[in-house]
């Protein structure tokens, strides 16, 4: 996993909803979400599973991708993620 790279990511919450965000350390961010210290939205929908990630050269383009994704409806979001390379978890993230 690339560290300190700007990335746009999507997690699937326990209720099936998606949460999109930006980070420069993806593993740490997922652990933060699952520890209940992440975004307010995800705290009520634990655990979360990483579904998609895009690495970008700078913060600006990663945040533009996040903004674009958040404007889409659910069907469009699923199509967006299918067109890219989905993240295949090599590590289980737990709430412990």
UniProtKB/Swiss-Prot annotation:
Coiled coil: none annotated. Residues 4-79 form the GIY-YIG domain. Belongs to the UPF0213 family. PANTHER family: UPF0213 PROTEIN YHBQ. This is UPF0213 protein BCE_0033. It comes from Bacillus cereus (strain ATCC 10987 / NRS 248). The lineage of its organism: Bacteria, Bacillati, Bacillota, Bacilli, Bacillales.
């Amino acid at each position: 996993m690339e560290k300190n790279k700007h990335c746009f990511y999507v997690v699937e919450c326990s209720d099936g909803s998606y949460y999109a965000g930006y980070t420069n350390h993806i593993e740490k961010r997922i652990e933060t979400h699952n520890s209940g210290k992440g975004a307010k939205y995800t705290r009520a929908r634990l655990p979360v599973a990483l579904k998609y990630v895009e690495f970008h050269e700078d913060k600006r383009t990663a945040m533009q991708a996040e903004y674009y994704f958040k404007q889409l409806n659910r069907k469009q979001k699923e199509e967006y993620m299918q067109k890219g390379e989905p993240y295949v978890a090599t590590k289980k993230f737990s709430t412990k």
